[in-house]
Regions:
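Single-stranded RNA-binding surfaces
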Residues: 1-179
Length: 179
């Protein structure tokens, strides 16, 4: 979603974001991607959420936990995009790896394939269980597709009002054909 910061609560170390749902979402400081942190941190021992965000600032978020009862959804700015074989985490370079369901020799083979992928700086990738038995070429193709999709989403986010929703369902990927 492309949301708008509606309120900053330094005492909670969080912001509330209007992203089009009935209740505003809750975005804790720890869920802020590096791009939202101040560039110049000199002389600052601790950074507060009010140093990172401002009221009415637009921000791209993903729902981590749906709203329940009287609580709004839990949000993160570390969004991810799921492809056929991979999950791309555009602003989380330390994240990544291989699905926990894959073990043994298969895991070792995928580690090798993962190391051969051309993953852009500041991005992370997880190989899904569907990536098992896929060549490095097929995995790279899926990664390239996800990067292009991310670029399109960001372009749309720049030019549209907030509340932009992007849901990639495995059965609704237009134009996502195997190599």
């Amino acid at each position: 979603y492309k949301g708008k910061v509606s309120r900053i609560e330094p005492s909670l170390g969080a912001a509330f974001v209007d992203f089009g749902a009935e209740r505003h979402g809750f975005l804790p400081f720890k869920e802020l991607a590096p791009q939202y942190l101040p560039k110049d941190r000199k002389g600052k021992e601790r950074i507060s959420i009010k140093d990172c965000l401002s009221k009415d600032q637009e921000i791209i978020v993903q729902v981590e936990k749906d709203e329940r009862g009287n609580k709004g959804a839990a949000l993160t700015s570390f969004y991810s995009l799921a492809g056929r074989y991979l999950v791309l985490m555009p602003n989380n370079p330390r994240a990544g790896g291989i699905s926990k369901r894959i073990e043994g020799e298969e895991r070792d083979e995928l580690k090798e394939a993962l190391s051969s992928l051309d993953i852009p700086k500041n991005m992370g990738v997880i190989i899904r269980t569907a990536g098992l038995g896929r060549s490095a070429k097929e995995l790279q193709w899926d990664l390239n597709y996800l990067i292009q999709y991310m670029i399109i989403l960001l372009r749309i986010a720049i030019t549209t009002q907030f509340y932009l929703l992007s849901q990639m369902k495995q059965d609704r990927k237009v134009g996502h054909q195997r190599p």
